[in-house]
């Protein structure tokens, strides 16, 4: 069907290369080619948007700091104010597969730096950037914090992370759940055979370590695939099961093909039709002399037919045992998919 050519005849990328960055668990460059012209931008932009906004991840959604009533406070013996501490907390990279909120705790006495690695976790929660500095304690200072970790996608502002029954002193935190931190892409020309007008898509993906760049890209592609499925309101054409082959057919099934399917010139086709030559099996049993005796059939038509038959491994003057078979029309239909 002509309509199927809309997608079946488009070039599909058949080459995918992954080049790890200086931190292979977090950075990678992926190259896909060849793509139809314009498809590099179409796919690159769609993948980038989904990577940054739609992948599930974990983040701190709220924090409670002992002795602190609100975000605009300061803590004795802590050099940073609470606002700065909360900003640092936002950047904690977390891996968690739990669907329910989890708790983390921190207790540290100065002097010294307080880092994400000082946080005590439970279950499957893992801190991916333990060297992240949260605050600095002076001699004798102490800080205690309790964090709530949840999973989600995209960016959720702090006001949406405040529970209705939030206790006094609970500070909601802006949550950036996406494990992907940066995505860029570029489009270059590439070759497909003799065609130089195709796209090469190069994407560089950086994550926080909760997911590999390759997996993140695969998840994004799957999301796009699933979202587009509803628009595919037709099914792929179903191939009917081929009828079983005759077990002892004494000739090549290609001989059951009709001569009007050989794409001959009008003159040659009409000559065969006037001579009641219907199938290739009828044609190849004719000799050159017999064909030249056909009205209006000349040397040019003869050469044309010889070339077509030669391309099929056949020639005029062949002996075909068992031709014509009984029920030739039924046999021709049964063997249609085999020639």
UniProtKB/Swiss-Prot annotation:
One GO MF term: DNA-directed RNA polymerase activity
Gene Ontology BP term (one): DNA-templated transcription
EC number: 2.7.7.6
GO cellular component, one term: cytoplasm
Domain of life: Bacteria
Reaction catalysis annotation: RNA(n) + a ribonucleoside 5'-triphosphate = RNA(n+1) + diphosphate
Residue ranges, annotated region (Alpha N-terminal domain (alpha-NTD)): 1-235
CDD domains, A to Z: RNAP_alpha_NTD
Keyword tags: DNA-directed RNA polymerase, Nucleotidyltransferase, Transcription, Transferase
Keyword Transmembrane: no
Tagged with keyword Nucleotide-binding: no
Region spans: Alpha C-terminal domain (alpha-CTD): 251-339
Family matches, as InterPro entries: DNA-dir_RNA_pol_insert, DNA-dir_RNA_pol_RpoA/D/Rpb3, DNA-dir_RpoA, RBP11-like, RNAP_asu_C, RNApol_insert_sf
Domain text: The N-terminal domain is essential for RNAP assembly and basal transcription, whereas the C-terminal domain is involved in interaction with transcriptional regulators and with upstream promoter elements.
Function: DNA-dependent RNA polymerase catalyzes the transcription of DNA into RNA using the four ribonucleoside triphosphates as substrates.
Record-stated family: Belongs to the RNA polymerase alpha chain family.
NCBIfam families: PRK05182.1-2, PRK05182.2-5, rpoA
Self-association and partners: Homodimer. The RNAP catalytic core consists of 2 alpha, 1 beta, 1 beta' and 1 omega subunit. When a sigma factor is associated with the core the holoenzyme is formed, which can initiate transcription.
This protein's name: DNA-directed RNA polymerase subunit alpha
Organism: Methylobacterium nodulans (strain LMG 21967 / CNCM I-2342 / ORS 2060)
Lineage: Bacteria, Pseudomonadati, Pseudomonadota, Alphaproteobacteria, Hyphomicrobiales
